[in-house]
């Protein structure tokens, strides 16, 4: 899987990983569930993994997520608030993002085939669920995540991550 880590976009790495799995494993092994997880989320719990596995078996596509606590604003291109979505309908998506292998593989194959036209269509892929949402008719289930499953990406994240790791 060495080449998987040398891609420009995250989705390129995931696609390379999916192709490597499909090529390296017997066919029956690619008929199961695949977890796609962000290495910047080191505190994922067994409970989240189990819930995602159960929901992926039931719905074929799910992502760990938590309801947002803050009000969210959608901004225009000049940084002015344009609209405010209903907070009770807005979720913060985490990883793992979990899918039946065939569904996520086929969605990524469509992405790969149309990759050159994404920018002109105004599409910026930000996660694996978006690949499924954009290139299939399949819905993605939001599965209960945890506020402790934080993404550690900036120095400001470290004290909270350390606190969680100590507890």
What is each stretch, according to the model?
Residues 25-26, 54, 82-83, 132, ...:
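Short secondary-structure boundary/capping segments
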């Amino acid at each position: 899987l060495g080449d998987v880590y040398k891609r420009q976009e995250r989705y390129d790495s995931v696609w390379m990983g999916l192709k490597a799995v499909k090529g390296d494993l017997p066919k029956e092994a690619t008929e199961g569930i695949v977890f796609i997880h962000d290495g910047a989320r080191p505190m994922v719990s067994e409970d989240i993994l189990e819930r995602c596995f159960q929901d992926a078996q039931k719905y074929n596509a799910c992502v760990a997520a938590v309801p947002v606590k803050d009000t969210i604003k959608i901004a225009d291109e000049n940084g002015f608030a344009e609209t405010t979505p209903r907070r009770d309908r807005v979720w913060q998506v985490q990883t793992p993002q979990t899918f039946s292998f065939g569904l996520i593989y086929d969605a990524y194959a469509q992405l790969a085939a149309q990759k050159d036209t994404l920018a002109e269509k105004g599409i910026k892929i930000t996660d694996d669920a978006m690949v499924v949402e954009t290139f299939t008719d399949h819905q993605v289930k939001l599965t209960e995540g945890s506020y402790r499953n934080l993404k550690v990406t900036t120095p400001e994240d470290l004290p909270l991550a350390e606190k969680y790791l100590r507890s």
